[in-house]
Design a protein with these regions (language model features):
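Short, well-ordered loop/turn elements at secondary-structure boundaries
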Residues: 40, 105-106, 162-163, 209-212
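Glycoside hydrolase catalytic-domain groove-lining segments
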Residues: 64, 68-71, 75, 79, ...
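N-terminal catalytic cores of secreted or lumenal carbohydrate-active enzymes
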Residues: 1-133, 150
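Aromatic/acidic polysaccharide-binding cleft in carbohydrate-active enzymes
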Residues: 114, 164-236
Length: 236
């Protein structure tokens, strides 16, 4: 859901449009557009990266917005939303603490983003041209995710001892410079065995924390960052 530049009314109407089977303006608009039966929608992210590109917000401000926006995202006709708050970027433990304290069980899940990346300014390095030092640095950065998870989980445990709020690491993976000759900003990168080892080691860590982690999503499935599939026109 667009919390950064959208309104509460807009998000509420999108939820109604997708999930209501009733006789209402938004459900009728969906029918007019060719879809009679409502969709089943489970996961609803209320904002994304609200600390950065999703609004450059303070955690206290976002927590108040989450409470407001999520209140109007209603359950229609047997569809129950699993509402997810926009969580921290890697080492921002204050963000998690503020949201757990101020939002608490108004959210079903809290997201977290962690990338194996050299930094956010300048070159991130080649996806395919690297030396032994680059390789071992990448493995070390990848394995740091365990310490990050432990610290976020400890904060969540302080406010939610029964672990009813899920942690969802919904963006993770390697991030390199775009492949030469591709469109800048489209984040098209090749994979090597280095990336495969990052995926394997990261998944191994995730399996240790399944009491709290209920979803993880590599970024992304096709043609962007550590993707499973690369396509070009009709070729895969």
């Amino acid at each position: 859901g667009n919390v950064g530049s959208g309104t509460v009314e807009e998000l509420a109407k999108w939820v109604e449009y997708m999930t209501s089977d009733g006789d209402s303006p938004m459900a009728n608009l969906r029918r007019k557009n060719g879809r009679d039966k409502a969709w089943k929608l489970k996961y609803l992210g209320v904002g994304n990266e609200s600390w950065g590109c999703g609004g450059s917000m303070r955690p206290e401000y976002y927590a108040d917005l989450y409470r407001r926006y999520s209140t109007y995202c209603r359950n229609y006709d047997g569809n129950r939303l699993f509402k997810i708050a926009s969580g921290a970027s890697d080492y921002d433990y204050k963000w998690t603490d503020v949201l757990m304290n101020r939002v608490g069980h108004r959210m079903d899940g809290l997201s977290l983003h962690y990338y194996t990346v050299t930094g956010w300014s300048g070159s991130k390095g080649s996806a395919t041209q690297f030396n032994k030092d680059d390789y071992y640095w990448t493995m070390g950065k990848c394995l740091e995710v365990e310490d990050v998870l432990k610290k976020h989980c400890t904060i969540m445990d302080k406010y939610d001892k029964d672990k009813k709020i899920a942690l969802l690491l919904d963006e993770w993976g390697t991030w390199w410079d775009e492949e030469p000759g591709t469109i800048k900003g489209h984040l098209y990168q090749q994979n090597t065995l280095r990336d495969a080892f990052v995926a394997s080691l990261t998944l191994d860590v995730f399996h240790k924390y399944t009491d709290r982690i209920k979803m993880t999503n590599i970024a992304q499935i096709a043609n962007v960052l550590q993707s499973m599939i690369l396509t070009k026109e009709d070729k895969m």
